[in-house]
């Protein structure tokens, strides 16, 4: 943070910067430093340990491609698990699907949820209801997602909305975790995770992809330009059973009011740089 700027530095000296009007909040939780800023042109910025999690004017460019391709590829996603997602964006998108009967969100840091509900406000009131156990479909569990997935199962879709695949979130990209996720899925089932910057976390992306191929019946990769991130941002999908992730229910998708992800152009998600594809 310099005078009136927030800069996140990525590997190899690459940075993403926002001009900011003021710092709204800085708190150290049990797990991490949480900051909220008011930017000049992109609304509020949520940062964790110095990394941009979202800007409110543009966060849908991340949450829509994270959630809807998997939800629209699954024939009947009634029970959904979100690991992470404390800002509320992922669960907001999941609940746009009327067939969903239950969403369980496992977030290790309650402070992220409380701060997001109070200062970020992208969830439409969902987080407050979940914090008070009053949401009819959403259930909040404060705990370790790695442990939770070892002990629970019966999910149609599992969404991992974690920090980058380095440091504290590294266990969420381990082969053991993928095996537990596969077991926890119903058949058919879909697992999706964000996988970092295509260009700047290439090794981490490739490692995760290769581990997932050892576990899931089919593995897919795609990317999307995300406002506030070092784009394009990568996502990985693991399938259990016979789901063809190359096909989605575009007609249902048209009714969701999406702003970034276009189900009619689903095939465009899979355009990766040629040198990345050659390494897969």
UniProtKB/Swiss-Prot annotation:
Q: Which InterPro entries match?
A: PABS, PABS_CS, SAM-dependent_MTases_sf, Spermi_synthase, Spermidine_synt_N, Spermidine_synt_N_sf
A Gene Ontology CC term for this entry? Answer: cytoplasm
Metabolic or biological pathway, per its Swiss-Prot or TrEMBL entry: Amine and polyamine biosynthesis; spermidine biosynthesis; spermidine from putrescine: step 1/1
| This protein's UniProt keywords | Cytoplasm, Polyamine biosynthesis, Spermidine biosynthesis, Transferase
The residues that cross the membrane are none
Q: Where is the PABS domain?
A: 7-240
Query: Binding residues for spermidine, per the UniProt record?
Result: 63, 87, 161-164
Q: Kindly identify the residues recorded as the active site.
A: 161 (proton acceptor)
Q: What is its main location?
A: cytoplasm
Annotated Pfam families: Spermine_synt_N, Spermine_synth
This enzyme catalyses: S-adenosyl 3-(methylsulfanyl)propylamine + putrescine = S-methyl-5'-thioadenosine + spermidine + H(+)
Instruction: Detail which positions bind S-methyl-5'-thioadenosine.
Output: 32, 107, 144-145, 168
Query: Which HAMAP family does the protein's record reference?
Result: Spermidine_synth
- Kindly state the subunit structure of this protein: Homotetramer.
The entry sums up its family as follows: Belongs to the spermidine/spermine synthase family.
Q: What does this protein do?
A: Catalyzes the irreversible transfer of a propylamine group from the amino donor S-adenosylmethioninamine (decarboxy-AdoMet) to putrescine (1,4-diaminobutane) to yield spermidine.
Q: What name appears for this protein in its UniProt entry?
A: Polyamine aminopropyltransferase
Species this chain originates from: Pyrococcus horikoshii (strain ATCC 700860 / DSM 12428 / JCM 9974 / NBRC 100139 / OT-3)
């Amino acid at each position: 943070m310099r005078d009136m700027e927030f800069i996140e530095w990525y590997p190899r000296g690459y940075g993403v910067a926002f001009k900011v009007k003021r710092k709204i909040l800085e708190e150290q939780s049990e797990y991490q430093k949480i900051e909220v800023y008011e930017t000049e042109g992109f609304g509020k910025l949520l940062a964790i340990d110095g990394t941009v999690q979202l800007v409110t004017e543009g966060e849908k460019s991340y949450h829509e491609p994270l959630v809807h391709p998997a939800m629209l590829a699954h024939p009947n996603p009634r029970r959904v698990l979100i690991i992470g997602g404390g800002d509320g964006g992922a669960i907001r998108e999941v609940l746009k699907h009327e067939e969903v009967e239950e969403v369980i969100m496992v977030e290790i840091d309650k402070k992220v949820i409380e701060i997001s509900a109070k200062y970020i406000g992208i969830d439409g009131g969902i987080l407050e209801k979940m914090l008070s156990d009053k949401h009819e479909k959403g259930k909040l569990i404060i705990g370790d997602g790695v442990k939770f997935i070892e002990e629970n199962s019966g999910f149609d879709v599992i969404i991992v909305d974690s920090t980058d695949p380095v440091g504290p979130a590294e266990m969420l990209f381990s082969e053991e975790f993928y095996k537990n996720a596969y077991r926890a899925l119903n058949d058919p089932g879909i697992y999706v995770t964000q996988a970092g910057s295509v260009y700047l976390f290439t090794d981490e992306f490739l490692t995760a992809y290769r581990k997932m191929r050892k576990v899931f019946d089919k593995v897919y990769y795609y990317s999307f330009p995300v406002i506030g991130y070092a784009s394009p941002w990568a996502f990985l999908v693991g399938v259990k059973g016979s789901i063809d992730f190359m096909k989605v229910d575009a007609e249902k998708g048209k009714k969701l009011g999406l702003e970034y992800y276009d189900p009619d152009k689903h095939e465009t998600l899979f355009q990766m740089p040629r040198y990345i594809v050659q390494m897969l």
